């Protein structure tokens, strides 16, 4: 049971496993209570909520139509004695709209933790997002690119702050300092060809089939390479079919999901480059943390905010 001694109420769509370090930091340094949704349309690994101090309740995300959903029992929290409310900046969450309206009436402050603007919004989406974000007291945005776009749309820059995005950096730094070259890939592939690497959920939006097609072209030109894919197919991509189509089975390692950070660090460290043909997301941060350069596309409206970490010709 919550005692409501905390002044900050955090209501998020879900608590992903990679957010555990930042949420734990928040719970130890800020007077926060946490409420997480139970599921998303696309499966993703959740953190163990019970291990987080000041975790109060899991809310049921009820999907109504398309991507729109309602978080059960979330609206009642606006009437509790919290001063601040930190919400995912998702216009698709209809209960968030109600919380924002009530917070205005009750003179409570609200903060969005959000991607913000992408640059590909239609006229209708622009109208909806402008109204939605205008209801917040402050906006915590992942990247400077989004802040720049939102400033041009008329948002007050003084109410926006760039918070970037990260993984468990402290732990990853310890691992990185102890990494050294290994034979992980030469042993598996029985060759010493350059290694392309991808980690993350295997989704259609990631366009991983482009890597397979590029590998075939390189092979025909006499420059064979290997590919390692770490992650679960959550979108019916069936990458194995594309691999078989180009007869590249001996050059592709479909590793599957992995949450052993020491193992992940070793794979990044020994790979030549990380490739994400679609939006790159946190994969870019993960890769650069271990010194592995990143290749992705430069159509920024269709990128994740983490693309800003890639410096052309230097880190990717």
Where do the protein language model's features map onto the residues?
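N-terminal subdomain of nucleotide-sugar transferases
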Residues: 1-59, 80
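Conserved donor-binding/catalytic core segment of Leloir-type glycosyltransferases
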Residues: 9, 187-206, 212-215
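A structural motif in glycosyltransferase catalytic domains
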Residues: 23, 196, 211-212, 227
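A short, histidine- and acid-enriched strand-loop-helix "catalytic/donor-clamping" loop
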Residues: 106-127, 135-138
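Donor nucleotide-sugar binding/catalytic pocket of nucleotide-sugar-dependent glycosyltransferases
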Residues: 134-184, 191, 198
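Acidic donor-binding loop of glycosyltransferase active sites
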Residues: 266-282, 292-293, 299-300
């Amino acid at each position: 049971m919550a005692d409501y001694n905390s002044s900050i109420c955090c209501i998020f769509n879900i608590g992903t496993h990679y957010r555990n370090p930042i949420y734990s930091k928040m719970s130890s340094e800020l007077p926060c209570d946490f409420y997480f949704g139970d599921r998303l349309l696309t499966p993703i690994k959740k953190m163990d909520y019970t291990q987080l101090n000041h975790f109060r309740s899991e809310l049921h995300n009820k999907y109504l139509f398309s991507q729109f959903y309602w978080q059960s029992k979330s609206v009642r929290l606006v009437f509790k004695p919290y001063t601040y409310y930190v919400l995912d900046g998702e216009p698709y969450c209809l209960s968030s709209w109600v919380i924002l309206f009530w917070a205005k009436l009750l003179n409570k402050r609200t903060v969005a933790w959000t991607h913000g603007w992408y640059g590909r919004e239609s006229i209708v989406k622009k109208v909806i997002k402008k109204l939605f974000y205008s209801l917040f007291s402050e906006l915590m945005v992942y990247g400077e690119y989004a802040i720049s776009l939102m400033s041009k749309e008329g948002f007050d820059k003084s109410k926006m702050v760039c918070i970037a995005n990260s993984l468990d950096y402290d732990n990853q730094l310890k691992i990185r300092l102890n990494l050294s070259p290994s034979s992980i890939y030469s042993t598996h592939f029985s060759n010493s060809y350059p290694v392309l690497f991808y980690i993350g959920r295997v989704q259609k939006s990631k366009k991983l089939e482009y890597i397979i097609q590029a590998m075939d072209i390189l092979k025909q030109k006499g420059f064979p390479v290997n590919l390692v894919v770490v992650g679960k197919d959550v979108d019916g991509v069936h990458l194995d079919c594309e691999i078989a189509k180009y007869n590249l089975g001996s050059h592709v390692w479909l590793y599957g999901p992995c949450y052993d950070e020491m193992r992940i660090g070793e794979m990044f460290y020994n790979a030549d480059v990380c490739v994400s043909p679609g939006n790159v997301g946190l994969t870019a941060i993960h890769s650069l943390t271990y010194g592995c350069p990143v290749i992705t596309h430069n159509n920024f409206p269709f990128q994740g905010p983490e693309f800003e970490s890639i410096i052309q010709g230097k880190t990717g």
